[in-house]
C-alpha cells in the first residue's frame, strides 16, 4: 500500500512540475535558441521512425528520368533551392534563420534516404521544421520531378545546373510563385502506385 501511495505522489509531483514548466514559459521557443541535445536526439528518432513507417505504404513506379527532371526543375528552382540552395545558388537569406536549418540536399544525410522516404517527405512535409507539404499543392508527377532533381544534385556542377535552366528556358533569378503548381485528380497518374492507404 505504501508503494502505491509513493508511486501516486511521484506521478502527481512529476505532472505538476511538467505543468509548471509548460505554463511558466520556461521552454524557449525561439528559433535562435538551439534544442537541448537530448531533445534533438529524441526528435530525430521520432522523425526518422515516422518517415520510415509511413513511407512504407508507397510503391514508386520506374519512370523516365529525363522526363521527371524536365517536370521537376522549374518547381525545384522556384521553391526548393530557396531554402536548401542549389549548385551555384546559396541558401536564401531568410532560410539561414530557420531552425532546424534546411539540409543541403546533395549531402549524404539526405541522399542515403530511400526514394519512398524522399517522396513521402516532399509530399507530406515535416512538422516544426518549415518543410511544407507539397502534396497539398502539387500533383505526383511534380513531386517525382522534384525528387529526380534532388537525386541528380550530387553530380551537378554550378555550370551544369545553369545549363539545365537555360535548356528549360528558366530564368536563373528568383521567379514568382506562378510556376504551374497542379492540384487536380491524381488517382490516375501513371508514375506512382500506392500500397494500401496513403496516410
Q: Which residues does each predicted region cover?
A:
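Sequence context surrounding c-type heme c attachment/ligation sites in exported
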Residues: 70-77, 81, 91, 112-117, ...
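Periplasmic c-type cytochrome electron-transfer domains
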Residues: 2-70, 93-94, 134-149, 167-198
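Short, functional N-terminal and low-complexity linear motifs
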Residues: 38-44, 84-90, 111-116
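Sequence/structural segment immediately N-terminal to covalent heme-attachment motifs in c-type
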Residues: 66-89, 118-120, 124, 176, ...
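Short, mixed-charge, low-aromatic patches
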Residues: 10, 27-33, 73-80, 100-107
